């Protein structure tokens, strides 16, 4: 949005903010920049439930404010939808892992494969002062489709998980993708890459 209002446009062209952010992000990874923690430790402990974009972002900012931060996530890898719902050609795993590692190096502890079922019990057991819920966008809104045994139906996140875990997903020669958002487009492109018609 700020690019459209950039006064540089009156001279030549607006500043490509996305390209500037990309360059800085690449430099941070390539030169292994570390985040400097300047705030005094508060002695407060915060539990974040969910290691997706929201949870990781909250951990980054809370740690910079001087709080002790732990993240619990039911998944086997941090990143949430960035890990399970964005194809590698859009966001390579190495880049995502590097960004997550920068947060871990700040002193944020991430506990994986751990599902929180009782928030108050976890808060008390871990002596946390606050809990931030960042459970994200993993819920599936399934539609009911009539089908026979020759038709295979799956949801986008299950499909992405199969692809991300390097297991070959079951794909028929002709595939119907139900949906019209970015996720449907990602799925369609991936299906084409596997050699099927979408």
Feature map (PLM): residue ranges:
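Structural signal for hydrophobic packing residues in well-ordered secondary-structure cores
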Residues: 10, 21-28, 63, 78-82, ...
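Catalytic cores of large soluble enzymes that bind and process phosphate-bearing ligands
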Residues: 12-16, 54, 63, 88-95, ...
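N-terminal Rossmann-like dinucleotide/flavin-binding domain of flavoprotein oxidoreductases
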Residues: 20, 81-128
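Extended interfacial segments that mediate partner engagement and assembly in macromolecular machines
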Residues: 27-65, 82
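Rossmann-like dinucleotide/flavin-binding elements
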Residues: 48-72, 112-123, 139-141, 157-198
């Amino acid at each position: 949005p700020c690019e459209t209002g950039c006064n540089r446009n009156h001279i030549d062209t607006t500043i490509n903010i996305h390209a500037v952010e990309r360059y800085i992000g690449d430099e941070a990874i390539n030169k292994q920049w570390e985040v400097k923690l300047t705030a005094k430790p508060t002695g407060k402990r915060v539990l974040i439930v969910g290691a997706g974009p929201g949870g990781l972002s909250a951990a980054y900012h809370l740690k910079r404010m001087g709080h002790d931060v732990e993240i619990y996530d039911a998944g086997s890898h941090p990143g949430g939808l960035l890990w399970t719902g964005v194809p590698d050609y859009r966001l390579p795993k190495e880049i995502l892992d590097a960004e997550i590692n920068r947060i871990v190096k700040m002193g944020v502890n991430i506990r994986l494969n751990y599902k929180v079922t009782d928030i108050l019990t976890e808060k008390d057991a871990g002596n946390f002062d606050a809990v931030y819920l960042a459970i994200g966008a993993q819920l599936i809104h399934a539609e009911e489709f009539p089908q026979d045994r020759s038709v295979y139906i799956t949801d986008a996140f299950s499909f992405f998980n199969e692809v991300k875990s390097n297991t070959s997903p079951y794909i028929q020669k002709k595939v119907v993708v139900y949906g019209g958002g970015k996720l449907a487009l990602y799925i369609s492109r991936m299906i084409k890459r596997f050699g099927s018609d979408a």
